[in-house]
Amino acid sequence: MGQKTALGSLLKAIGNSGQGKVVPGWGAVPVMTVIGLLLLVFLVILLQIYNQSLLLQGFSVDWNGN
């Protein structure tokens, strides 16, 4: 048998603490909502740059490779 160490006990407690359990209430929904909204804003900004509807000073978009 191996020895029990403080680090091993800590990692086991962290790794198995939430396995198979459902968090009551809203859980991670607010965090995932914020992440989803930030991703949406990022994608909209990329789309506006691609369509040249968002103009940036000193930044030209040339898709012809010239």
Swiss-Prot record:
NCBIfam families reported for this sequence: PRK02624.1
Write out the similarity annotation: Belongs to the PsbH family.
Coiled-coil residues are none
Q: What is this protein called?
A: Photosystem II reaction center protein H
Q: Where in the cell is it found?
A: Cellular thylakoid membrane
Record bears the keyword Transmembrane helix: yes
| Origin species | Prochlorococcus marinus (strain MIT 9301)
MF terms in GO: phosphate ion binding
